[in-house]
Amino acid sequence: EHVETVVKSMPEYITEFKTAYGKNVKITFALIADTIGLYERTLVTPSVYDDFLNGDNNALNAKEKEGLKTFIDAGCATCHTDVGLGGSMNMLNVTGTYKHMNVGSFKGDKNGMVRVPTLRNITQTAPYFHNGKIWSLKEAIKEMGKIQLGAELSDKDVASIEVFMKAFEGRKPKVIYPMLPASTEKTPKPDMN
């Protein structure tokens, strides 16, 4: 309700919503949330892995292709399946218990299912896991092998998978930030009490 009130208090936002959805648009919280979601889905960072998926067989070098094979053969692709290399719901601790599971209050949904995180730009998003207890990508790969695959991945396999994961590093787009509308007399002010 508060979000709707703020957005509706700014004529520039109303104009933008009418431009996007038509002059009879009803600005609701759901529409605002959907609009933000649509915007977020445009924030992609294409990588050499995407180039490879789009048919450029030379986009991945030999070591990255070897890492892809290891990633698939080890079973990582069982959960990291879609173009974003994540996104499905799966159990955590399938074949073992995450060594830092008791740190933090994360439990998953009512069935213990967790959303598999994307691996895009994974080399740039440490620390890892729900509680940020693992800082090394190699250690995260090794831990996932144990708790999700029941596998003691060799140092060679871990290094190979890590090389492949570097192929997920996206090219950052040039971002031109929009000028946000100024608040008006009708815009609710923060409650500082």
Question: What are these language model-derived features?
Answer:
Residues 48-143, 149-152, 163, 176-193:
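Short glycine/threonine-rich turn/loop motifs
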